[in-house]
């Protein structure tokens, strides 16, 4: 970095190159701070958190999904496996003398399901206003909530378990795409309240859906039949095409919108269920994950499989949504993918598939009265807008923050600790001298009295 600063002063590199190099440096330095926690219960001033033994939990039954508002990057929404939801202010926290930073919920609803404590599968903020949010769950419903009162303002019964939902951030419509046990993708119109429109084509339960980041009418879906389909929601016909993991060439003349020379009707994206979809920021690539423990990248202009090999480290065996995360492209000169693995988060370079870093999730030791140790499985990832920060949710009920900690930060902390230790030593020495002086004065006073 010092060489970049020198070259910037000499004018040999642009300010943009310097900023991107610094952002890349910070991106590679992400790690979980030991003293940042999310908890439903506050701490006393002198209470100590033993995170290595049992960290505070945000949801006692586990956290299934999190989301961060894309406008301010300030509010985090979490949904629990017991149908509870909570909203957290990332800029407001409590601290104690031990140095622990504790986030407490701004609002918390212990139960959102009317048919028992059936877990939430997905939470998301309303795409154009963070004062409302959506939830889907095992109670077969999609719900629209008020962020201030945490009360449901609308409920849509889809008559089958809703594995995930997605909203478009660029659309003029208010369609919510829902992935459910039904083989058709259900579209719910928040403007009219209808949920009759569906996209038929899959032969198994739909597990994941994702809207194109640039085209408001293009949608991708993945299902248990191993297929990944793209759709134009304005068309009543079949899907635009199917992605094929065995095709590394693609369809010449195909524009990804159902037009061109031809479209593919058969093919599989994975040998197992497709349970995760993520578009690149420009919409050129689609990243898919499957229960065959593979992650694949497709060029959506041709449908070609890029053949990026992400190695054997991926864990994915549950028929639940497991979505990788791609940070904003301005932070890196290469496309980066974060994969929520068991007990860790893996960082990959997208086009080559090379593993860049493992972000280890701090392990906790279960208490003696815990009969079963909860899995420390990563269930969801969310990027904080306007910051180089990532947040992860876990099946053990914790929410973790990932921030850059560079070598310069470590040196500054060591210098701070050394300064504190020196100050404590000097203070102890001054106290010793005061005590000795007081003893001398007391001795002289006693002699005079005698």
Predicted features along the sequence, with ranges:
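Per-blade loop-tip surfaces of WD-repeat and WD-like beta-propellers in eukaryotic adaptors/scaffolds
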Residues: 46-49, 87-109, 139-175, 181-206, ...
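Terminal intrinsically disordered, low-complexity extensions flanking WD-repeat/beta-propeller proteins
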Residues: 2-41, 250-256, 309-450
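Beta-strand-rich domains and repeat architectures in extracellular enzymes and scaffolds
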Residues: 55-83, 339
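Conserved strand-to-loop turn within each blade of WD40 beta-propeller repeats
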Residues: 79-82, 136-139, 178-182, 222-225, ...
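Loop/turn segments within WD40 beta-propeller blades
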Residues: 67-73, 124-130, 166-173, 203, ...
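Blade-loop segments of beta-propeller domains
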Residues: 57, 94-125
């Amino acid at each position: 970095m010092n060489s970049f600063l020198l070259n910037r002063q000499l004018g040999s590199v642009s300010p943009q190159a310097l900023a991107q190099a610094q952002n890349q440096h910070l991106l590679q330095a992400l790690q979980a701070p030991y003293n940042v926690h999310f908890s439903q219960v506050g701490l006393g001033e002198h209470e100590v958190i033993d995170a290595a033994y049992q960290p505070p939990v945000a949801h006692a039954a586990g956290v299934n999904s999190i989301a961060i508002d894309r406008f301010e990057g300030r509010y985090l929404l979490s949904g629990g496996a017991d149908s509870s939801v909570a909203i957290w202010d990332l800029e407001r926290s409590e601290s104690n003398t031990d140095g622990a930073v504790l986030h407490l919920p701004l609002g918390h609803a212990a139960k959102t399901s009317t048919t028992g404590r059936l877990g939430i599968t997905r939470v998301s903020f309303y795409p154009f206003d963070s004062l409302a949010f959506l939830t889907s769950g095992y109670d077969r419903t999609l719900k629209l909530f008020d962020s201030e009162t945490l009360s449901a303002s609308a409920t849509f019964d889809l008559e089958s378990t809703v594995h995930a939902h997605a909203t478009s951030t660029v659309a003029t419509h208010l369609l919510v795409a829902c992935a459910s046990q039904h083989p058709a993708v259900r579209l719910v119109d928040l403007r009219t309240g209808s949920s009759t429109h569906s996209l038929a084509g899959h032969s198994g339960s739909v597990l994941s859906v994702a809207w194109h980041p640039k085209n408001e009418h293009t949608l991708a879906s993945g299902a248990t039949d191993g297929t990944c389909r793209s759709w134009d929601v304005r068309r009543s016909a079949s899907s635009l095409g199917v992605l094929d993991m065995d095709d590394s060439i693609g369809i010449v003349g195909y524009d990804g919108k159902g037009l061109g020379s031809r479209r593919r009707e058969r093919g599989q994206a994975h040998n197992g269920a497709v349970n995760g979809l993520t578009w690149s920021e420009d919409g050129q690539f689609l990243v898919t994950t499957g229960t065959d423990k593979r992650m694949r990248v497709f060029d959506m202009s041709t449908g070609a499989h890029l053949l990026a090999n992400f190695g054997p480290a991926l864990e994915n065996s549950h028929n639940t949504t497991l979505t990788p995360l791609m940070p904003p492209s301005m932070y890196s000169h290469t496309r980066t993918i974060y994969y929520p693995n068991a007990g860790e988060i893996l960082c990959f370079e997208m086009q080559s598939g090379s593993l860049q870093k493992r972000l280890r999730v701090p392990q906790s030791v279960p208490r003696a009265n815990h009969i079963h140790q909860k899995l420390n499985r990563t269930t969801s990832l969310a990027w904080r807008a306007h910051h180089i920060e990532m947040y992860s949710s876990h099946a053990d009920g914790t929410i973790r923050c990932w921030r850059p900690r560079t070598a310069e930060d470590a040196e500054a902390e060591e210098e701070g600790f050394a300064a504190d230790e020196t100050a404590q030593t000097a203070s102890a020495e001054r106290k010793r001298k005061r005590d000795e002086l007081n003893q001398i004065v007391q001795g002289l006073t006693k002699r005079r009295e005698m």
